[in-house]
């Protein structure tokens, strides 16, 4: 047995499923998950000593690559002064100033510890601000594991085939209305059914938890218009897309202004951080200035703030997003060319530093129903054969892939060459 296999066997006796987040268990592809010893740049190194070109990037945060020296040094320096104070720090103020500078729609920001905390808190704030209970989300979109959001969810819930989680009371779920991504008619129908009851729409501007589904040109502006028409707030969940699709997020890339924005992943540079923010009048409703309660013992943790501040300063440097997009375009086109040459039907969606691979005869993949028709069994074989080639992709047909600026053109070429060999075996 490999060391990963031994560790997985031991972990399953101690941790549910042997992992601390379900998708890591390889449930979506079968086999034994890799146990990682270290990472550097574009590469992961497992406990058995094998190196992999990494396109998971810790599920998105590692836009600069692993173990970036600026982030590592910031963490070391901050840790030398203490790990947590439970009191405000100067770095919290600097971090808030940087985030609101980079994302102009955020007049104010509140730091939390995860993307789930960010979305959960933003929805509570929207409900408190509007005095309404119902929310709209989209089928196949994942916004964390808060009860109200585990209704027809994507990500690990979709991988496990459990889009409606047990443990969520029907009385909670009834306030969550689910519409079809990229379908404005379904959203209007929900508003017309409940014209005075919907507090907000929450949406991934690029749906990254049913693989990678970009919005149709009219979709996000249409959501903004519907929210304005019916007096609801628009929450854009940029936990995955923030600072990755563009410096100011997918909202800037697609030209839509939300009332509230949720951030995570990249904002922590690899540390556990989330944030939500937006219009001042909405944020003023948050405790302690307003009645909507939200709190956290470790929110604004000095180590996490230092890591995030260092990361965002690097991400904001000229050329970062141009490089990220060009590398992703090269990979996407190379995979398409390799698949075509092998006679394998394939769709690759990509935007900014995100991409999605779909084994399908369809010409496009634009919503949840398109995604679930794709050939999952072929993806499983593709995943394991690529892993044997030293390429680590997301271990689920329903998860996006992530590029970093640490990937080299040689890494991209090697990945495409590996895919050519694998397609020949499929």
Swiss-Prot record:
Leading EC class: isomerase
UniProt modified residues of type N6-(pyridoxal phosphate)lysine: 265
HAMAP family (UniProt xref): HemL_aminotrans_3
EC number(s) reported in the record: 5.4.3.8
Keyword line: Cytoplasm, Isomerase, Porphyrin biosynthesis, Pyridoxal phosphate
Species: Klebsiella pneumoniae subsp. pneumoniae (strain ATCC 700721 / MGH 78578)
InterPro entries hit by this protein: 4pyrrol_synth_GluAld_NH2Trfase, Aminotrans_3, Aminotrans_3_PPA_site, PyrdxlP-dep_Trfase, PyrdxlP-dep_Trfase_major, PyrdxlP-dep_Trfase_small
CC cofactor: pyridoxal 5'-phosphate
Catalysed reaction, written as an equation: (S)-4-amino-5-oxopentanoate = 5-aminolevulinate
GO molecular function: glutamate-1-semialdehyde 2,1-aminomutase activity; pyridoxal phosphate binding; transaminase activity
Family listed: Belongs to the class-III pyridoxal-phosphate-dependent aminotransferase family. HemL subfamily.
GO cellular component: cytoplasm
Pfam families, alphabetized: Aminotran_3
Chief subcellular location: cytoplasm
SUPFAM superfamilies cross-referenced by the UniProt entry: PLP-dependent transferases (SSF53383)
Protein name (record): Glutamate-1-semialdehyde 2,1-aminomutase
Recorded superkingdom: Bacteria
Metabolic or biological pathway: Porphyrin-containing compound metabolism; protoporphyrin-IX biosynthesis; 5-aminolevulinate from L-glutamyl-tRNA(Glu): step 2/2
GO annotation, biological process: protoporphyrinogen IX biosynthetic process
UniProt-annotated location(s): Cytoplasm
Assembly with partners or alone: Homodimer.
């Amino acid at each position: 047995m490999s060391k990963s296999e031994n560790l997985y066997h031991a972990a399953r006796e101690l941790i549910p499923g042997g992992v601390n987040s379900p998708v890591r268990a390889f449930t979506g592809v079968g086999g034994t998950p890799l146990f990682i010893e270290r990472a550097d740049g574009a590469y992961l190194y497992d406990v058995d000593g094998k190196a992999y070109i990494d396109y998971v990037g810790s599920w998105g945060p590692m836009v600069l690559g692993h173990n970036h020296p600026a982030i590592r040094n910031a963490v070391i320096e901050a840790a030398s002064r203490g790990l947590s104070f439970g009191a405000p720090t100067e770095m919290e103020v600097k971090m808030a100033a940087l985030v609101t500078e980079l994302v102009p729609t955020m007049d104010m920001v509140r730091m939390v510890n995860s993307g789930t905390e960010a979305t959960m808190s933003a929805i509570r704030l929207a409900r408190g601000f509007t005095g309404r209970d119902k929310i709209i989300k989209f089928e196949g979109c994942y916004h964390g594991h808060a009860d109200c959001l585990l209704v027809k969810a994507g990500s690990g819930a979709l991988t496990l085939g459990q889009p409606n989680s047990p443990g969520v009371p029907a009385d909670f779920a009834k306030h969550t209305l689910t519409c079809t991504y990229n379908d404005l008619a379904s959203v209007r129908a929900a508003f017309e059914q409940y014209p005075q009851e919907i507090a907000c729409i929450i949406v991934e501007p690029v749906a990254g938890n049913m693989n990678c589904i970009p919005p149709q040109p009219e979709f996000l502006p249409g959501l903004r218009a519907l929210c304005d028409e019916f007096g609801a707030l628009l929450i854009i969940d940029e936990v995955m897309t923030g600072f990755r699709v563009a410096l100011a997020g997918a909202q800037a890339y697609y030209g839509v202004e939300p009332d509230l924005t949720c951030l995570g992943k990249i904002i922590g540079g690899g540390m556990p951080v989330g944030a939500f923010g937006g219009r001042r009048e909405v944020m003023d409703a948050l405790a302690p200035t307003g009645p909507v309660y939200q709190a956290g013992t470790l929110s604004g943790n000095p180590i996490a703030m230092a890591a995030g501040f260092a990361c965002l300063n690097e991400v904001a440097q000229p050329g970062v997003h141009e490089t990220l997009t060009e590398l992703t375009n090269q990979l996407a086109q190379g995979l398409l060319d390799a698949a075509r040459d092998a006679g394998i039907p394939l769709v690759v969606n990509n935007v900014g530093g995100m991409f999605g691979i779909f084994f399908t005869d369809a010409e496009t993949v634009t919503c949840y129903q398109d995604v679930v028709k794709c050939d999952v069994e072929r993806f499983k074989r593709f995943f394991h054969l690529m892993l044997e080639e030293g390429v680590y992709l997301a271990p689920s047909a329903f998860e996006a892939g992530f590029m970093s600026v640490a990937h080299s053109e040689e890494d991209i070429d090697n990945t495409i060459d590996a895919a050519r060999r694998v397609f020949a075996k499929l």
